[in-house]
Each structure stands twice: as structure tokens, then as C-alpha cells.
């Protein structure tokens, strides 16, 4: 006969599919009390309520989230600095678009995680600190958390949504406005700064929003790469290896909350600055 207590202590022996849970309510009730499978809500709540407490000797939850945010923002900033200018140029200059669109289009379908083997071969566990040749100091140890391989995965994930939206935003600008401004003597700089960028801004901002969301989703995978010893993604991975499911769930909730807050910030900017776009369609 099937021993409930024995199975509860050996959760790997069965598969907890929705169908199994519905067809075995008695066994499910026993397993709910197993903190390795489903930790009590109060344990998860305690971790979230005290983000400054040390967690399984891996630093605080808030500290790891902060490190992850810095990594995401660094990789994301690099994607913005390349994606927006290149996208605007490709949208405005048809020749450049024809030249680069096919080339970039070959890389767009590649998932960010597919780059991992190449990234590790290229960069190994090098960080910004080692790449800059900094001496051992407080700045060195801070920048040593920013592994180039992690930043690249985040960068490549955010780049294409930003680039595509910038191209689309410029291509949909009314060309009559551009031609009229050129006839009236406007310089290329004036056309870019006073016509193209303001008109394309809603599409660009939407691309920035999508890109940040993708960058945040790439975070956990990036922090699983060799060389990572901090960050909420690494915290989740380490917590799993030591059987701390409560920390895993708390980390997942933290990622969800921070990602939602970042998305809400961009939505607020879109509503605040570009509400007119809704009525111009």
C-alpha cells in the first residue's frame, strides 16, 4: 500500500500535475504540509516583510534585488544607447534600412539564452572591473559583480524590441511634414530633433518599455551563468539547491513585483506624455 508520510518525505517519487492533485485529494492534503514542496505562507511573508535580513548566508533579499537591478539597468542602458540611434537612422535612411535589416533580422529570432555558449567562450567570467584593469579597491569589488557575460545576455534581449520600435516609429512619421520642413530650409538636425523624434517618441517609448521587460526576464537566466555569486536570480538557484523553497518563492515574487513596478512607470510616462497618440489614430 501507498504510505502517505513516506511519499511526503520523498517528493521526487511522484509527479504533481494538476490531474494528480485533483484525483488524489488525500495525498495532496498531506503534501501541503511539506515545506519542501509548498512552504507555509507565513514563512514567505516573513521573508518579504523583512527584506534587510540575511537570507541563507547570501546577503539580504533587498541587497540581491539591488545588485540585479544594477545589472539589468547596465545591460538595458547599452541596448538603449545602440538601439534608439540605430533604429532612428534605419527608419529615416532607406538605404541603411535595406543594408542592415536582413542582417539584423537573422539575429532577431535567436533567443537570448542561445547565446550563452558563445558568450562564455568570448567573455568567460570577466567583469567590468577586470576589463577596465582596475586595482583592488571598493570600486573593483562593486564592478566585479557586473559580469560581461550577464550584461550581454540582458543587452541582446532588450536590443531588438527597442530597435524595432524605433524603426517603426520613424517610418510611420508623415513624410509630408519632413518634406515641407526641408523645403522651408530646415536643417537635418532640425528635422530630427523637431519633427522625427517628437513624432516617433510614443513608439520609441513603447519599445523601451518592452525592452526593459525582456531585460528583466533575462535576468534570472543571466545570473545562473558561471561567476555569479549574487543577485536575486542566483539567490533563487542557490535556495533551490539547499531546499529552501520559501526563499525561491519569495525571490520569484520579488522579481514579479519589481518588474510590474518598472512596467507601471513606463505606462505612467506613456499616459502622461503621449495621451494624444490615442486620439490621433
Place the predicted regions along the sequence by residue.
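Periplasmic/extracellular loop-to-transmembrane helix junction in inner-membrane transport proteins
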Residues: 4-77
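C-terminal transmembrane helix and the adjacent membrane-cytosol boundary/short C-terminal tail
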Residues: 171, 249-281
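Transmembrane alpha-helices
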Residues: 188-221, 250, 254, 266
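Alpha-helical membrane-interface segments at transmembrane helix boundaries
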Residues: 62-70, 74, 97, 104-107, ...
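Short cytoplasmic-facing helical segments at TM-TM junctions of multi-pass membrane proteins
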Residues: 165-204
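Generic hydrophobic transmembrane alpha-helix motif, especially the helices
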Residues: 105-161, 168-169, 224
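Membrane-helix interface segments
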Residues: 92-100, 145-148, 188, 244
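Transmembrane-helix boundary motif in ABC transporter permease subunits
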Residues: 74-104
Amino acid at each position: 500500500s501507498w504510505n502517505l508520510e513516506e511519499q511526503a518525505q520523498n517528493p521526487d517519487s511522484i509527479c504533481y500535475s494538476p490531474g494528480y492533485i485533483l484525483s488524489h485529494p488525500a495525498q495532496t492534503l498531506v503534501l501541503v504540509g511539506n515545506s519542501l514542496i509548498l512552504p507555509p505562507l507565513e514563512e514567505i511573508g516573513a521573508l518579504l516583510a523583512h527584506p534587510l535580513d540575511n537570507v541563507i548566508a547570501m546577503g539580504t533579499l533587498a541587497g540581491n534585488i539591488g545588485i540585479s537591478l544594477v545589472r539589468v539597468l547596465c545591460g538595458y542602458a547599452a541596448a538603449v544607447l545602440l538601439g534608439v540611434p540605430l533604429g532612428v537612422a534605419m527608419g529615416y535612411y532607406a538605404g541603411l534600412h535595406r543594408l542592415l535589416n536582413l542582417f539584423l533580422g537573422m539575429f532577431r529570432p535567436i533567443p537570448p539564452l542561445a547565446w550563452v555558449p558563445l558568450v562564455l567562450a568570448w567573455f568567460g567570467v570577466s567583469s567590468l572591473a577586470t576589463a577596465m584593469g582596475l586595482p583592488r579597491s571598493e570600486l573593483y569589488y562593486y564592478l566585479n559583480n557586473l559580469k560581461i557575460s550577464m550584461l550581454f545576455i540582458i543587452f541582446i534581449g532588450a536590443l531588438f524590441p527597442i530597435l524595432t520600435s524605433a524603426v517603426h516609429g520613424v517610418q510611420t512619421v508623415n513624410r509630408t511634414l519632413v518634406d515641407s520642413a526641408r523645403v522651408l530650409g530646415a536643417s537635418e538636425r532640425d528635422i530630427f530633433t523637431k519633427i522625427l523624434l517628437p513624432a516617433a517618441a510614443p513608439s520609441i517609448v513603447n519599445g523601451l518599455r518592452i525592452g526593459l521587460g525582456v531585460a528583466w526576464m533575462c535576468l534570472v537566466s543571466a545570473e545562473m551563468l558561471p561567476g555569479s555569486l549574487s543577485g536575486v536570480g542566483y539567490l533563487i538557484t542557490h535556495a533551490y539547491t539547499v531546499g529552501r523553497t520559501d526563499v525561491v518563492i519569495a525571490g520569484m515574487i520579488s522579481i514579479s513585483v519589481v518588474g510590474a513596478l518598472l512596467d507601471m512607470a513606463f505606462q505612467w510616462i506613456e499616459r502622461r506624455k503621449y495621451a494624444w497618440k490615442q486620439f490621433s489614430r
